[in-house]
Amino acid sequence: MFTLTSYFGFLLAALTITFVLFIGLNKIRLI
């Protein structure tokens, strides 16, 4: 159970970081 929760948290963090990087690249491209 703990491994599943930690895995889900890691996946959520990875998705958030990717989303932030994608938005950052789009902003740089707009400028």
Curated annotation (Swiss-Prot):
Gene Ontology molecular functions: electron transporter, transferring electrons within cytochrome b6/f complex of photosystem II activity
The gene designation is petL
- Would you tell me the protein name for this molecule? Cytochrome b6-f complex subunit 6
Any one cellular-component term (Gene Ontology): cytochrome b6f complex
Q: HAMAP family recorded for this chain?
A: Cytb6_f_PetL
Cystine pairs: none
Q: Does the keyword Metal-binding apply?
A: no
Q: Does the keyword Zinc apply?
A: no
Q: What does this protein do?
A: Component of the cytochrome b6-f complex, which mediates electron transfer between photosystem II (PSII) and photosystem I (PSI), cyclic electron flow around PSI, and state transitions. PetL is important for photoautotrophic growth as well as for electron transfer efficiency and stability of the cytochrome b6-f complex.
